[in-house]
């Protein structure tokens, strides 16, 4: 079960908007205003502040695989890569709307970004050039992900209700996943809010704006697990709440972690679908929607809309 470790405080009264654990599990990158705070998880203190050149707030951030750089996506349509020691390395300009999601490939030489402009762009992080633009969807592309151990494929999720798998090198669409008979509702499609590959890249964790979390078999193109809390009266949530896989360090079955609008966090066994734990938001420091969930090893970071950021440990 999860044990609460500590709340993560920010500076100057500004609330956190994004939070991600570093690849070595030692640090937490937190966006605050137009800056990034590097929080030392073991010492429980802010060890560094990175200043960005963004003109508008962040949408997302991610660490490079070597833990030396952080990429940021902003509402100002731009993307920046900042080195922890040397500062700003690149500013990528090319999207024509806010950038929503981004991820590095395993080697760190490519950065994939997605935007409200309905496209995915592939950037060369070494020379700072745009390599390819993928016209991926008919609505905003709100999530992209690359498998941890396989950089040959890329997944995307969009407000058009579709999930796509691409060849990361050519940009060719390999597969389109839909919710079949459930894909279209009376009031339209159910927008996708987040996608996340499993460690072996065989499965894709997908969350939609109706709060439902599903595991897709990427090869078979079918849903193999569905996780759902109490049905929603209006069918669609007001916020895009976070979710992630947690892969326990003891090698046991991965967990599916999902946050919700009332501040609750649900933890399921990904194989049996059994609910292992419910973290009550009213008791565990979250009194507003859980916008972000990020896991590394046995550590989970949760971030709420009101800026409350918390660290947890699976024991």
Swiss-Prot record:
Transmembrane segments: none annotated. One of its GO terms (cellular component) is nucleus. SUPFAM superfamilies: WD40 repeat-like (SSF50978). GO terms for biological process: regulation of meiotic DNA double-strand break formation; subtelomeric heterochromatin formation; telomere maintenance. Changing residue 182 to K: Results in nearly 50% loss of H3K4me3. GO terms for molecular function: histone binding. It is found in: Nucleus; Chromosome, Telomere. Disulfide bonds: none annotated. Gene3D superfamilies: YVTN repeat-like/Quinoprotein amine dehydrogenase. The keyword Transcription does not apply. Coiled coil: none annotated. WD repeats lie at residues 53-93, 94-133, 136-178, 187-228, 238-278, 285-315. CDD domains: WD40. Keywords: Chromosome, Nucleus, Repeat, Telomere, WD repeat. Component of the Set1C/COMPASS complex which consists of SET1(2), BRE2(2), SPP1(2), SDC1(1), SHG1(1), SWD1(1), SWD2(1), and SWD3(1). PANTHER family: WD REPEAT DOMAIN 5B, WD40 REPEAT PROTEIN. The COMPASS (Set1C) complex specifically mono-, di- and trimethylates histone H3 to form H3K4me1/2/3, which subsequently plays a role in telomere length maintenance and transcription elongation regulation. COMPASS recognizes ubiquitinated H2B on one face of the nucleosome which stimulates the methylation of H3 on the opposing face. SWD3/CPS30 establishes COMPASS trimethylation activity and may also serve as the anchor point to properly tether and space the other subunits. This is COMPASS component SWD3. It comes from Saccharomyces cerevisiae (strain ATCC 204508 / S288c) (Baker's yeast).
